[in-house]
A protein has these predicted regions:
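Axial heme c-ligation environment in periplasmic c-type cytochrome domains
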Residues: 35, 44-55, 68-96, 104
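Bacterial N-terminal signal peptides that target proteins for export
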Residues: 1-9
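Sequence/structural segment immediately N-terminal to covalent heme-attachment motifs in c-type
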Residues: 22-40
Length: 106
């Protein structure tokens, strides 16, 4: 009986953790951001989650992230340099993605 309960609890934990990681990059980011960034792992630039964690206590996170995407730079990360507007993101894509990134760690 204990092994059945343990199996149920373990399975429930795996299902719940799977939901937490099941965030896909929005279409606005796949073509222009996905070359250098992923949701949960560093590629050439930091993961979207790492950026979100960096700004999670900042009420102006989305606007700061948008400014960083717009002007480009390294932003204190130890790797990579982001070109201005990434691979050509327009203003509406930048605003959408900035809010998406800022909200990941909330």
């Amino acid at each position: 009986m204990d092994s059945i309960v343990g199996s149920i609890i373990a399975t429930a934990g795996l299902i719940i953790s799977g939901f937490a990681l099941a965030v896909d990059m929005p279409a606005e980011g796949k073509a222009k951001c996905g070359t250098c960034h992923a949701i949960d792992k560093n590629i050439f630039g930091p993961s979207f989650m790492a950026v979100s964690e960096k700004y999670k206590d900042d009420k102006d996170a989305a606007s700061k992230i948008a400014a960083n995407i717009t002007v480009g730079g390294s932003f204190g990360w130890l790797f990579g340099y982001m070109p201005a507007r990434g691979l050509g993101a327009n203003d509406s894509e930048i605003q959408f993605l900035s809010k998406f990134i800022a909200d990941l760690a909330k």
